[in-house]
């Protein structure tokens, strides 16, 4: 029972820290462009100004 006195506040503080990190990510715009990465991975990179390397 003595360990619960330490574990409960630690668990609550870690949960609060995770919530603060999530809210910071929302506020800083981390979730603004969800489709951009999926389109960039499909891009060939053959645009102007980019050099394409072939083997």
Swiss-Prot record:
Taxonomic lineage from the root: Bacteria, Pseudomonadati, Pseudomonadota, Alphaproteobacteria, Hyphomicrobiales
Ranges annotated as spanning the membrane: 4-24
Role played: The four proteins FixG, FixH, FixI, and FixS may participate in a membrane-bound complex coupling the FixI cation pump with a redox process catalyzed by FixG.
UniProt gene name: fixS
Organism in which the protein naturally occurs: Rhizobium meliloti (strain 1021) (Ensifer meliloti)
Full protein name: Nitrogen fixation protein FixS
Biological process terms in GO annotation: nitrogen fixation
Subcellular location: Cell membrane
UniProt keyword terms in alphabetical order: Cell membrane, Membrane, Nitrogen fixation, Plasmid, Transmembrane, Transmembrane helix
Any one of the GO CC terms: plasma membrane
InterPro entries to which the protein is assigned, alphabetical: Cyt_oxidase_maturation_cbb3
């Amino acid at each position: 029972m003595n360990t619960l006195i330490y574990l409960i506040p630690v668990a609550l503080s870690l949960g609060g820290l995770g919530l603060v990190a999530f809210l910071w990510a929302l506020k800083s715009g981390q979730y603004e462009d969800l489709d951009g990465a999926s389109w960039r991975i499909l891009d060939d990179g053959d645009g102007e100004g980019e050099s394409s390397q072939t083997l």
